[in-house]
């Protein structure tokens, strides 16, 4: 039996098995994309074009964020190739797959993140527990990863302020303290421990018969599956949700 897991699948199962079931067993997705997700997707597309030395969309919030990336991140030193998909065998019958935001010329994975947190230092502290970092290091066999962190603006549009005026203020607001590039390092022992953890989790996912809910996660974050969490049945008529074309629509593999 072949099991394929992505970093998102692993993180989702650890946070809430019920959400994992809805998203990756029943393959459901919300029909509408949240504003935050839309901005994040546009920002990533802009950064991809920057790394390819191509033109990008300077409009809107995502455009101003990309301008800050281009100005404050030393991205030209990486000689990076963006959007690198992978499918790597971790153990017998278990494969990790996904997409690196970029891979440098010397094989270091690069990941771009946005955050609404007011303190980038606190966000950086959380990277010590980030599965995605370790997974990307495992698949690239690199002891180091580069994370770029873009803080979303904390300023809001004024009541009598035009969109153009607001975006101009956002451009002026961005400074090096709002945009960071962080080197994350893991020892060989830490990466081996993560590999063993993923193998164990994959076994749990294969064998589980009951995808239980984690109410602690519900209390901390808003879940896009909240409206069907308690009463979803495979034969029910879906409102606000649809079946995905495939389990990992973000990938081509």
Predicted regions: what they are:
Residues 1-108, 151, 158:
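Metal-dependent nuclease catalytic cores that hydrolyze phosphodiester bonds in DNA/RNA
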Residues 4-5, 138-253:
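Metal-dependent nuclease catalytic regions and adjoining charged, substrate-binding loops involved
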Residues 11-12, 102, 136-139, 220-221:
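A general structural signal for short secondary-structure junctions and capping/turn motifs
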Residues 20-26, 113-114, 172-182:
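Short acidic (Asp/Glu) and glycine-rich catalytic loops that position anionic groups and cofactors
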Residues 26, 51-55, 114-117, 138-141:
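Hydrophobic/aromatic-lined pockets within catalytic cores
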Residues 36, 122, 126, 191:
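Flexible, glycine- and charge-enriched loops at secondary-structure boundaries
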Residues 87-133, 139:
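Non-catalytic protein-protein interaction segments used by genome-maintenance enzymes to assemble
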């Amino acid at each position: 039996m072949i099991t394929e897991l992505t970093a998102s699948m692993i993180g989702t199962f650890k946070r809430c098995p019920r959400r994992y079931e809805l998203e990756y067993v029943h393959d459901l997705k919300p029909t509408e994309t949240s504003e935050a997700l839309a901005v994040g997707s546009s920002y990533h597309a802009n950064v991809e074009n920057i790394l390819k030395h191509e033109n990008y969309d300077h409009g809107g919030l995502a455009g101003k964020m990309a301008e800050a990336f281009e100005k404050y991140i030393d991205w030209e030193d990486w000689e990076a190739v963006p959007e690198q998909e992978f499918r790597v065998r971790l153990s017998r019958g278990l494969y990790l797959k996904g997409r690196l935001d970029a891979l440098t010329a010397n094989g270091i994975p690069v990941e771009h993140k946005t955050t609404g947190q007011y303190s980038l230092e606190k966000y950086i502290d959380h990277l010590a527990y980030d599965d995605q970092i370790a997974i990307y290091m495992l698949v690239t066999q690199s002891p180091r990863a580069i994370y770029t962190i873009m803080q979303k603006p904390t300023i809001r549009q004024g009541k009598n302020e035009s969109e153009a005026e607001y975006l101009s203020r956002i451009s002026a607001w961005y400074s090096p303290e709002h945009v960071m590039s962080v080197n994350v390092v893991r020892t060989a022992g830490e990466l081996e421990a993560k590999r063993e953890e993923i193998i164990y989790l994959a076994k749990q996912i294969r064998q589980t018969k009951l995808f239980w809910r984690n109410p602690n996660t519900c209390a901390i974050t808003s879940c896009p599956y909240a409206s069907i969490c308690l009463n979803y049945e495979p034969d029910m008529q879906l409102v606000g949700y649809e079946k995905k074309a495939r389990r990992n629509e973000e990938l081509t593999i």
